[in-house]
Amino acid sequence: MKSSRFTKFISIVLTLALLLQIAPLQAFATTDETVPPEEVVEAAEITAPAVGVVGEVDDLRSEDGKHFRLSDGSFLSVSYGMPVHYTDEDGQWQDIDNTLTFQQGADSYVTAENGEAVTAFSADLSKGHLATAAWGDTSVSMGLMQPSQLRSILADPEEDAADAVSPNGEPLLQPDYNADAAVEVEAAPATMSLSQEDGWKAEDLMPEKLSSTVLYRDVYPGVDLRYTAFSYNLKEQIIVREKQDSYRYDFLLELKGLTAKMQEDGSVVLRDSEGNAVYGIPAPYMEDAKGASSTAVSYTIQEVENGIVLTVTADPEWVNSAAFPVTIDPTLVKDIRIAEMYDGDDPMFVTFVGSGTPNTIYTQRQHTYLGYGSEYGECWGYVHFNGLPNIPQGAVVTGASFNMYVSTSSNGYSGNAPELPLELYAVTETSNNYFDRMVNMSWNNRMKVDTDTVLDYTIVTKNDQGHYIGWDMTGLVKQWYASTNPSTTVAILPAQDKDFLANLCTTIKVFAYDPEVSPIFAVEYRNNVGIEPYYTYNTMGAGHAGAAYLADATGQLKVVKEVASYASSVNPFSVNLVYNSDYFVSSTSAYLPHGSTMD
């Protein structure tokens, strides 16, 4: 009996102790009203800190991409759609540096040597020289000629120079160029501003030395010439500010180790002695101040003793009816195939199609129109990623986005709508050659799109001019990385709204290729290789092999074996042999056990 009563007593004590532990603290609070109640923090007031960029991870560079370490321990892989690095003599990736430095002896502004590439601009036009682009042992030097020089060069041996005509048969009426015109080096754009406070932004990720721009004012009355060195390319813009008697412009291209040939699409390809395409000049187009554009501009070439005369001729009827200034846009591009989409090996292809011009191909344009407009009709943008950004083996994708820059020009946001919703869709059509498919695509033969599923949308307003807009692609990109043959192609469509279509036609102008604000494809990931504090593991002893860790989230196995250590109050250290299951490969020769690294 005594034992039974004692057991009951113990049970009561334990029950009371348990009740005291789980009772709310307020039950024991003092009744003294002078003690203020504890401040309650609303959930809305608790915000996660912005994820900023700590710095670049140089070891993970590629020709067109960079990797950045983020403040939360994750990483960001960025593809710029064009080369931003070159390999040095040691095989290491270095930033392309187009910063201009004045060289007194050459009387020129010269970029750094980016591997085999270098570009130079004349300080003035006293000798008619404009710019030189060199790649290895080959080069192209561009210059102007006074009418007397031009007539002498183009005249038939039996013809009087005064009777000479241009390659397209027109009289040579071009005025003298302004030999006193001096170069103006334009201010470089604000780029690569890595911040940990406000979070990362697409406009802050552009490499800071990728481009430089110079301007020659009043080369001809009412005509300026602007040149931009970006990546490995040289872009020229003929800026016509007022009406002219003629819209024909002749340039002497002195070629070293190169020969020129006109292509069926109106472009010019420069090949070396082995037949390799070194440079190309895409078929030109022109655009006025209101955004109206035309392809009524063409090239003709005529071989001369030390190169070619390249004649650019624009349709006077179109130019005279346009809103000035009118910009005529030829570009000298490294390794060209077709137009401004550069090369079939490039990491990104961007173009658009318009219902208002259903048979027109727009792949030669530097910019893309999205929305609804009077000239192009309904505009769809297409983006193909020619391969996904490289991420380390074993890493997990946590986010992805595609970002495009909205032009600051007067037609950057054009129309009556206060806002323009743009939706992102997956392209369902696959192709054996996406490059050829897209450079020959018009509205009538556009790629098929899954319009039943909106992946993401963004709403654009006038305030977005001069900034990047973006779309979240996380779910789709995860599928791409898991697939063996993904299409890696998306389309950007305006929202379908009858009232919007009828009354509020609006388009935006975003850049498909630009030296300062190229499209940015960004993939966020976490590197799960090794032991990370934000994951949980099942830990077990592995005897002499060390300690084994099995990741709860991924199932990856890690084994850590300490091989050396030094105890010190000043600078202690340890060296571990780390096995990661994701690194395991079958190999007949290795300096470490298969799947292992030194940490």
Each predicted region: which residue ranges?
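Intrinsically disordered, low-complexity segments enriched in small residues
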Residues: R5, T30-G91, V214, P221, ...
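C-terminal segment of classical bacterial N-terminal signal peptides
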Residues: L19-F28
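Residues that cap or anchor secondary-structure elements
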Residues: E33-D335, P515
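Extended extracellular/luminal ectodomain segments enriched in beta-structured repeat modules
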Residues: K243-R248, G377-W380, N390-F402
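A short beta-strand element within beta-rich, extracytoplasmic domains
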Residues: Y249-L255, F385, A395-S409
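Short beta-strand-plus-loop segments that form exposed binding edges in beta-rich domains
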Residues: A314-V319, I492-A512
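Flexible, small-residue-rich N-terminal segments that precede or flank a structured functional core
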Residues: T327-N390, S409, T428, N444, ...
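Beta-strand-rich interaction/scaffold domains
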Residues: V406-Y481, P486
